[in-house]
């Protein structure tokens, strides 16, 4: 992404610089109270500002990113080992679903990443009509799976959106967060899906 934006706008951008700014960008996004698109804007503007983009050129960056997003969903990068971790969870008898603030393309993105078959249910906010942290979207996933809040566990990477939203629906939540990042007090956390599987699968690794 950095290389394509840089080439299109004549800016010197490196992926490493964007990665280094990701924790601060995530904190900026957490502070936004509003629609998910507003959180995304805060995240990207912080990310590119920290990577050295002058404030007067952020508008060009937003326009460029919007075009790239139409080509390929920018929020669907898959971490190494994701499928293996999901398969461990499923093999242990856990039923999996997705609740996503998105633009109607989550199902297609999961198929492109060869992950759709890992999930019984996918609830996309653009199709459902409400976004996290609204508890209604979490309840829709529960209803589709046929489980109660007490039988479910939600894992997400944003405290305000995922953890508080799940709790409002009566669901226990785990925050997916790098080990180096700070988390609010009293929040259960894991650093990766692999670590989650280690916690939830009886006997650990096979």
Residue ranges of model-derived segments:
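Asp-based, Mg2+/Mn2+-dependent phosphohydrolase catalytic module
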Residues: 7, 12-16, 49, 56-62, ...
